[in-house]
């Protein structure tokens, strides 16, 4: 959906909906009180499937990203958004993959970009990803990914924090 048309719920510190705004307004105002979902695809070797965002992305173009991420649109639950984004970005059906919730994070407690639920999807093959969203991908151990990021590989802002939180030993 085009950013100018996408309406997101605005939430209070308890993640209760208090209003709505256009996605473009949220970003132009630097707000963090909206909802997102993020997922990591992990194979049986413990490697993360990490894609690189396309050059057409308005935010973080050509940066490494979580395996799947997206905004929770107004009126959706986190789980609704997970299902929609899995289909849009990775051509996966939520009911056909092994998914587990890794955690629920808030910007006030964890200094992340938004209220978020982070999931893990177990797959031993590369997803059939949407090539409008991503241009390439890598299977990396968490330690390899952290090393890349520490050496300056461009990445979406929350990526290193999420990998360290959920996958660093």
Swiss-Prot record:
EC primary class: hydrolase
GO molecular function, one term: hydrolase activity
Motif extent (Nudix box): 69-91
Cross-referenced Pfam families: NUDIX
Keyword Hydrolase: yes
Cofactor(s), by name: Mg(2+)
Protein residues bound to Mg(2+): 85, 89
Family statement: Belongs to the Nudix hydrolase family.
Protein name (Swiss-Prot/TrEMBL): Uncharacterized Nudix hydrolase all7351
Species: Nostoc sp. (strain PCC 7120 / SAG 25.82 / UTEX 2576)
């Amino acid at each position: 959906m085009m950013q100018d048309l996408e309406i997101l719920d605005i939430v209070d510190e308890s993640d209760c909906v208090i209003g709505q705004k256009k996605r473009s307004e949220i970003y132009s105002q630097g707000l963090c009180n909206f909802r997102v979902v993020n997922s990591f695809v992990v194979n049986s070797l413990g490697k993360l499937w990490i894609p690189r965002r396309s050059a057409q992305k308005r935010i973080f173009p050509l940066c490494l990203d979580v395996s799947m991420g997206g905004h929770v649109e107004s009126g959706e639950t986190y789980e609704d958004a997970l299902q929609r984004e899995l289909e849009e970005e990775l051509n996966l059906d939520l009911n056909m993959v092994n998914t587990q919730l890794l955690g629920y994070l808030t910007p006030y407690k964890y200094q992340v970009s938004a209220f978020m639920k982070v999931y893990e999807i177990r797959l031993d093959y590369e997803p059939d990803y949407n090539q409008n969203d991503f241009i390439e991908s890598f299977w990396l151990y968490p330690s390899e990914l952290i090393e890349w990021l520490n050496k300056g590989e461009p990445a979406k802002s929350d990526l290193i924090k999420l990998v360290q939180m959920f996958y660093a030993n």
